[in-house]
């Protein structure tokens, strides 16, 4: 009986061996492909921003700076926003939107238009919130608005209205009831003046710098107020603004600390590699390769150049 079983077992092994030989041309590539796929789906190269994202996720308020014309900054911020939205309930606060038009923003966002694309809807919402399509590059900010709509993320307008900005330019900042933060002093005043002077190539007269200092301080106070409102609702506010606004020494963090000293604020400056600046002004810095851009001072030099005798009107803008 045992011999018969052994003979049967031997016959079965020979039969299966023959089948394997016939199928080998198909089986071996399949196994190889599976092994390769397994390697490809294994651990990827570590994301260099992963640690920074975790720091953002543990904060009470996140401030992300930018150079307005740097596409690399906008790309990485959009990636961070998506990653943060996976970890926390966030609210996006944008410097580019008019805070007084928040009701219009909300109304347009809630209004559905048949067959409207996400891109068209995002543009309609931004327009309702006072986005300046001539002053800002919409292609940089569209992905943020689209993300907010697509993922049902609250979107808050953070900036002063045009009317408020004009009031400040006329020296009427007192009409806005903007409080000077407790940490504001001569050092902060001089740093902000120096930043504005340098940003305008040293061409601005003092008569223009003074209201611009007041305007930026008012903008920072306004954005801080919006961020605090979002944070009080239990969400993580993520503020998108220029680097000067997110600086710890004279920007939004100063206003946040004055209003809520225990708030955990993370200010991230987005710079270009080799860019002169003060990395210590931020809690973290992210640098990207620089882009080529025309001399920004040329237009200002033309604007403030002495006019020929007998000419009338303002220099061309």
Q: How would you describe each model-predicted region?
A:
Residues 23, 32, 37-59:
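N- or domain-start disorder-to-order transition segments that initiate the globular core
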Residues 231, 245-317:
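C-terminal regions of proteins
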């Amino acid at each position: 009986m045992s011999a018969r079983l052994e003979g049967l077992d031997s016959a079965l092994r020979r039969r299966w061996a023959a089948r394997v030989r016939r199928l080998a041309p198909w089986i071996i590539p399949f196994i190889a492909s599976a092994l390769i796929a397994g390697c490809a789906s294994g651990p990827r190269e570590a994301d260099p921003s992963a640690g920074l994202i975790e720091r953002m996720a543990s904060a009470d308020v996140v401030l992300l700076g930018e150079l307005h014309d740097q596409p690399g900054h906008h790309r990485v911020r959009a990636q961070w926003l998506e990653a943060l939205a996976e970890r926390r309930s966030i609210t996006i606060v944008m410097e580019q939107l008019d805070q007084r038009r928040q009701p219009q923003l909300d109304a347009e966002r809630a209004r559905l238009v048949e067959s409207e694309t996400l891109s068209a809807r995002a543009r309609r919402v931004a327009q309702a919130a006072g986005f300046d399509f001539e002053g800002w590059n919409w292609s940089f900010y569209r992905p943020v608005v689209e993300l907010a709509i697509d993922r049902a993320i609250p979107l808050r307008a953070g900036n002063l209205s045009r009317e408020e900005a004009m009031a400040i330019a006329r020296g009427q900042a007192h009409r806005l009831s903007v409080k000077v933060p407790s940490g504001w002093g001569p050092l902060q005043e001089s740093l902000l003046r120096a930043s504005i002077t340098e940003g305008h190539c040293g061409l601005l007269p003092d008569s223009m710098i003074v209201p611009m200092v007041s305007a930026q301080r008012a903008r920072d106070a306004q954005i801080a107020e919006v961020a605090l409102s979002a944070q009080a609702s239990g969400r993580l506010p993520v503020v998108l603004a220029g680097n000067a606004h997110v600086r710890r020494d004279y920007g939004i963090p100063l206003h946040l600390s004055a209003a809520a000293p225990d708030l955990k604020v993370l200010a991230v400056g987005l710079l270009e590699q080799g860019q002169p600046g003060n990395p210590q002004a931020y809690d973290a810095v992210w640098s990207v390769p620089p882009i080529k851009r025309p001399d920004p001072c040329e237009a200002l030099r033309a604007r403030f150049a002495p006019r020929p005798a007998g000419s009338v009107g303002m220099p061309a803008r």
